[in-house]
Amino acid sequence: MQGLLIREASINDCEGIQSVHMGTPGPWANAVECVPWIRKRIERGYYVQVAEINAKVIGHAEWVETHDIKGKFLYLCVMQIKDDYQGQGIGRKMVNDGIQLARAQGCEKVVTIPDEDTGSEKFYAKCGFSKGRQIKSVSIPTAAYGYSQNYKEVDSAPLEIIRKCHFIFGLSQASARHMWEINNEKPLGDNRVTTTLISDTGDYIQLCSQYNNPRKAWVLCWSNNPNPMFVKDILTLGRSKGFQEILFDFFAEYEAYFKDFTREIKHYAIETYKFT
């Protein structure tokens, strides 16, 4: 497309980014939240990407390098194109730009979670992405079961935990790094409290209230030797912090941890990837 430029964003692009996301959920369409969100992402080393035509921002994406226990990849957190410019190859060019960055950074693949409600999995298939692991989701009421092992409350989980331990719960985004950032490096104005426990064996559990429901928390959990009682430990922590429900997002391989609960486990998403 004539006049199209894909480039790294700056804080000065926030007004254009807001226009791209107008009418969508999330912080980018909000004039109060967009600037601190973009500033924090840039500070934390995300590749905040924009597409522009004749100096007008018409697309926005955010990528983050993730080096977890299974390898190194570049994760696409969000991508949005203005309605009037969709279907013109702009998204594909933004993806290709991200793939070039992934190669330059030594990442073995790029990964994302397509929004199945919008049919974006078809777009990624056309870009050469393959379907990976299934992500499932379940919400369970909190209860005072008691703890199955000794825990200590600490200020935060260290970033290096994503390289040392498997990411058991918390996959509302298929990147341990991105979810760690959301819970531990919040932008200015995000006053949600993250509670962190570490066990005697080095397992980490984090609870943080959801953006739109302060009585419901999502959980992040890292472990190399998952405790069969993890779920009850997490629900016990949730009850002690005043939450009514805990949201668990996880790869299907961990579904057995919920065999003692009657809540329906739902399909959430499919991890999608492309080797670089």
Locations of regions flagged by a protein language model:
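Active-site rim helix/loop that mediates acceptor-substrate recognition in acyltransferases
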Residues: 14, 18-21, 25-53, 57-65, ...
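Amide-forming acyltransferase catalytic core, primarily the GNAT-like/NAT-type
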Residues: 29, 52, 127-213
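Conserved beta-strand in the GNAT
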Residues: 50, 56-65, 73-75, 80, ...
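Conserved acetyl-CoA-binding loop-helix of GNAT-fold acetyltransferases
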Residues: 81, 87-100, 125-126, 226-239
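Conserved GNAT acetyl-CoA-binding A-motif
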Residues: 102-115, 241-250
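Conserved catalytic-core motifs of GNAT/GCN5-like acyltransferases
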Residues: 111-113, 130-144, 263-275
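Conserved active-site tyrosine of GNAT-family acetyltransferases
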Residues: 123-125, 129, 256-261
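Charged, low-complexity intrinsically disordered regulatory/assembly segments
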Residues: 189-276
